[in-house]
Every structure is written in C-alpha cells, then in structure tokens.
C-alpha cells in the first residue's frame, strides 16, 4: 500500500467484504488461511493481466469475497453456508479452512483433490465466465466446447448429487464435478489452468529442471516468462506440465503419499483448457 494511498488495505485485502466472526481461536486461524489463499489468487490474476476491481470500484462488474460460517440456532439446528458465486460476490464457507472438515468432504464426495486455494480458483472462474464469456462473441464457441449453459442449473445439480458422474467421465471432463453443468465444467477447467500456471511459475523460479538417466522419461527445462506469456503458448504449457507432474507424482510416491496430480488430460479436456487459456489472454 502506498504511503499516500487513502485505502489502508492492500489490493487483496480490499476485496474482502465480510470476515468471519472472530470470537474463537479457530475462526481467527481460519481467516488467516482464507486471506493467504486469496492473496495467492489475486497475485495470479494480476500476473495474468485479468480485470480485477472491487465492487467499490465497479459496483456492476467488480468482485468481492465474504467468509461466513454456518449458523446454529438455540435448539441446535444448523443453517449451512454454501460456497459459491453470485453476481461478483464469492462466498467461502469458513469450514473449508479446517483441514479435517475439508478432507472429510473430499472423501464423502469422492474427490481426488480438494484445497482451499482450489475453491478460490474455481469460484473466480464463475466470475470470469460472466466477465469474459457471457454476452460476448466467445459465447457460441463456449457452447461448442462446453455445452449449452442455458440447461437448467438447479436440475443439473440435483441429478449430479443423486446419481453422480456418468461412466467414463474421465474421457471428456477434468473432474467428476465438471460433468454437472457447462458452468461447472468451465469453472473446473479455469481452476485447472490456474493450477498449471502457478505450479510451473514456482518450479521455474526455484530452478526445477529434469534430466533423467532413462531415455523414455520426460525432460523438463522451464524458460523464464511472465504468466500471461506462459498461458499464451498453450501447447508448450501442456508439454511442460506433463513433465512436471510426472516428477511430482514420482516424488510423492517415493514418500509413500498419494499422487500429487491425480488427473488425466484427455484430448477433449485439453481443448477445454485451451479455450480457457485463450479467454485469459484475449
């Protein structure tokens, strides 16, 4: 924050509309985790030169965040806070900052991957659909790649939670949840591109390179370039990502842990990621 700036909050903190109640140590710790994840998100968005204003700056097109916890009545009834996006207001349930709760939710919903930062990336993807795709000349191309977003969203959610993802969903979708509706497919794909760019930028910054002894294993040398340029060269991004995740998975297996990257990038999924990348850099 500049010394002469009237706003005492940094670019990331100024996007928080509502913080959790701070009456418990758990909520204080949760708020810190939420702000840390949001700060990393904001850094990435600015690095990609994406439009980013608060609702105080642009009431109709800005974005803000509220961090809310479930309400419990005097008789013990719980009113759930749903994580989601609505017209530029992103709500994150404070419970998602609790590692135990989040892991339980991951297992209950049969997800291979569920992180606090991933929630931010997913929900901001919904926001950027409104800004970059809706009412734009990209809309018809979006429908060709992802499907028609005019399909009933509430019904799609009901079907997904009652019946789950269709068989062999991995052939066409990055995650089971992406099968729910074109909006969710887009948001999951958006989050995935952000995962890729952030991890590759970090790997490059610390000098990660791979030169295996075997000829049948991938090599990796990541050139220094700004995130927007990295996304703009999408084919190179995918090649570097394949090599990096090969290494990541082998390292975590060596530690006796699950794969760090439990995803398959099929041909149709790559084309969806390509569409997202093109929208990011347009």
Regions of interest found by a model, annotated:
Residues 178-282:
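Pan-zinc metallopeptidase signature
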Residues 1-25:
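Cys/His-rich short segments
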Residues 143-189:
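Acidic/histidine-rich catalytic neighborhood
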Residues 58, 137-148:
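Short, glycine/acidic-rich hinge or "gate" loops at secondary-structure transitions
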Residues 114-135, 187:
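Active-site recognition of the HExxH zinc-binding catalytic motif
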Residues 100-120:
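Short pre-active-site segment immediately N-terminal to the catalytic Zn-binding motif
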Residues 28-99:
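Auxiliary, metal-adjacent structural segments of Zn-dependent hydrolase domains
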Residues 81-107, 135, 157-168:
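A short mid-domain helix/strand-loop element embedded in enzyme catalytic domains
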